[in-house]
């Protein structure tokens, strides 16, 4: 018993969020470098000697240098077992990011030191704040020309409405970025570069009072640091861990993921300050992670992670207890007992079978097509459902059909699997078969990914016609006959994959018309996955 409790206490499960190009994937890779999970870090942009970022495993990601799927990686560091959820950096994949954040206990927000808070940072931060998650900020790219650090803190507070507490302070920036000052321990960490970030960086550490740093840093930088320290001590907020835990205050770290400057100090402080797995809400109350009964929920489904395997993996966040390979669990939505075949843990596309896993861990299990996002798995002796994960209303629509009608079977299989992953939403028109469907997406890049994946994974070329619809609403209730709804000529009634009735509209006026002309009609912009 004590063993499994100690294992859970070691777990730290967090997601990394950022605007595209702020350096999120590079930072993820450097965590793995320091954790000993990889020996040599390859630059994401340079792609030297064909080294690709460990977490960017889908071919389209390698070509574009962006993350469009969420990757899951586990490694050990300093007595902790760390689960990193690397989220899509592209704004068109915000729904996938939201689901990933549901599986995390805290978030690391990466901010570009030259640009400050950017559009996608705001959106992702908003999702984190809705969950009242602890958020830790890493201000990246200090090795390039950067904004004034005080200005960056002000920017975060003004743009995001969260207080900041700098845990360390940069010494210089751009080519003069020499290191960081650790405020907690009142120590200077001066970096000795030269390996271009491919291996762990060497550092000279010592007390801020040590005169040798005047020589190492140069008088101008040393004097500026002393002035900044004084200003911070007078003007800044106190570090209130209770406010950190509820997402009202963010500890801020400065560094450069590319050169590794500041990565290890950040990782060490972060692990000290974050918590082990947190309790989760369910229909029977909070589920304690230290409960001895296993429970988990599905937050992601990924088909064809390996083209050679043609497989489909359901990713689960374990929320309580211990999971043992071959253990019988109860699938609430399916209403039956299961044995989870070959539970796996991942380092991007590399996988290994696990014998056991604990609350906080992410495991992948083979999915023969029975799981959906938000499903609960629990011990047969203690049945309950975790809170569902909402479905975002798509904003872009297209009519999609296979170019070759003889490939209808592959087309249906492909769109079904990609829809079950949550990457697209598929709508069926009344009296029209599956040979032609309407696809809804949150962002237009998802159309490109759909086309790419159908061709590369299912050998199906598609014809895609964009539609003028902008809104989808689920029909929650209606007093009359749904087939006789009074709608404008440019609105269309459809069904989703769960056979729920929806209406797609071109504008707000169409929505208001439907509500005004159909007594008792209740519409919702969100579909719950546990329905």
Description of each model-found segment:
Residues 1-531:
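Structural and coupling elements of P-loop NTPases
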């Amino acid at each position: 018993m004590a063993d499994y409790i100690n294992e859970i206490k070691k777990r730290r499960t967090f997601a990394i969020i950022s605007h595209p190009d702020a350096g999120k994937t590079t930072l993820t890779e450097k965590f793995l470098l320091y954790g000993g999970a990889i020996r040599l870090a390859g630059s994401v942009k340079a792609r030297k000697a064909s080294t690709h970022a460990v977490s960017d495993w889908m071919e389209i990601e390698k070509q574009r240098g962006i993350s469009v799927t969420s990757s899951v990686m586990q490694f050990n560091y300093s007595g902790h077992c760390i689960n990193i959820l690397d989220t899509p950096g592209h704004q068109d994949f915000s729904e996938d990011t939201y689901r990933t954040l549901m599986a995390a206990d805290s978030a690391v927000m990466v901010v570009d030191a030259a640009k400050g808070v950017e559009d996608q940072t705001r959106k992702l931060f908003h999702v984190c704040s809705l969950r009242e998650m602890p958020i830790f900020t890493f201000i990246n790219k200090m090795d390039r020309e950067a904004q004034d650090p005080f200005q960056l803190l002000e920017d975060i507070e003004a743009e995001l409405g969260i207080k900041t507490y700098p845990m360390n302070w940069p010494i210089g920036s751009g080519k003069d970025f020499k290191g960081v000052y650790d405020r907690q321990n009142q120590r200077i960490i001066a970096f000795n570069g030269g390996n271009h970030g491919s291996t762990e960086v060497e550092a000279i550490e010592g007390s801020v009072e040590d005169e040798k740093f005047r020589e190492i840093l140069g008088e101008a930088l040393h004097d500026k640091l002393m002035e900044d320290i004084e200003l911070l001590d007078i003007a800044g907020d106190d570090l209130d861990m209770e406010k950190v835990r509820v997402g009202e205050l963010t500890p801020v770290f400065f560094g450069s993921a590319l050169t590794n400057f500041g990565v290890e100090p950040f990782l060490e402080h972060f692990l000290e300050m974050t918590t082990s797995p947190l309790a989760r809400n369910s229909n029977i109350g909070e589920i304690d992670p230290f409960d001895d009964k296993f429970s988990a929920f599905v937050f992601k489904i990924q088909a064809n992670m390996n083209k050679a395997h043609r497989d489909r993996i359901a990713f689960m966040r374990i929320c309580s207890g211990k999971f043992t390979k071959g253990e019988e669990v109860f699938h609430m939505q399916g209403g039956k007992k299961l044995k989870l075949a070959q539970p796996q843990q991942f380092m991007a596309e590399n996988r290994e079978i696990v014998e056991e896993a604990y609350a906080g861990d992410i495991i992948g299990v083979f999915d023969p097509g029975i799981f959906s996002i938000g499903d609960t798995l629990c011990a047969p002796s203690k049945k309950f459902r975790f809170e569902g994960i909402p479905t975002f209303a798509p904003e872009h629509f297209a009519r999609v059909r296979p170019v070759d009608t003889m490939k209808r079977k592959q087309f249906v299989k492909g769109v079904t699997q990609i829809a079950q992953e949550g990457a697209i939403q598929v709508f069926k028109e009344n009296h029209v078969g599956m040979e032609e469907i309407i696809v809804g997406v949150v962002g237009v890049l998802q159309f490109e990914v759909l086309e790419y994946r159908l061709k590369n994974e299912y050998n199906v070329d598609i014809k895609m016609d964009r539609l003028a619809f902008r809104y989808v609403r689920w029909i929650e209730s209606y007093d009359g006959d749904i087939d006789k709804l009074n709608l404008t000529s440019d609105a269309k009634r459809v069904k989703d994959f769960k056979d729920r009735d929806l209406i797609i509209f071109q504008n707000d006026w169409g929505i208001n018309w439907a509500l005004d002309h159909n007594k008792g009609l209740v519409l919702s912009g969100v579909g719950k996955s546990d329905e």
